[in-house]
Amino acid sequence: MSKRDLKKYLGELTKEQLEEQLIELYEKFAPVKVYYDFVFNPKEDKLLQEAKVKISHEYFPIKKPGAKWRPKAKMRRSVAQKLIKHFMMLGVDSYIVADIMLYNIEIAQTFSSQNFIKQELFYKSILNSFEQAVNFIVSNGIFNDFKLRINAIQNET
């Protein structure tokens, strides 16, 4: 169904029918529920902190109580990419998205400065993340706000 057909269909419905359909979508589909929960109660700071914790655990996992060793770092870029994509889908402020993009790179740099990493793919991945972050920041017109962090990341490499 095209957008035009959908608009026509929705225009023919009464207010009560529209409300019923939205409630049904809200109950049936988790992404719709997540979206509306965020729209009516946007806790961006809480989301940002949770995302930063998840990303930092990818590089610096926490030892569980009673465990003999700390788990090995997984260093998955995909975890941060999924979080960033989720933030964009929710319509989170571009400053917060840019912050999480740069945080991902900064934590990866911190890890690589403390640990020797053989895989060249890791460094290519971080470079891709950096390029995406800079492109996002420039395209949203917020470069001056993040210039110091971008320069710090560039100087670290």
What are these regions (language model features)?
Residues 81-118, 122, 129-134:
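Extended amphipathic alpha-helical scaffold segments
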Residues 52-86:
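A broadly used, surface-exposed interaction patch
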Residues 2-66:
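N-terminal interaction modules that seed assembly of large macromolecular complexes
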Residues 1, 13, 27, 46, ...:
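Alpha-helix boundary/N-cap detector
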Residues 121-157:
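Eukaryote-biased recognition of C-terminal alpha-helical segments
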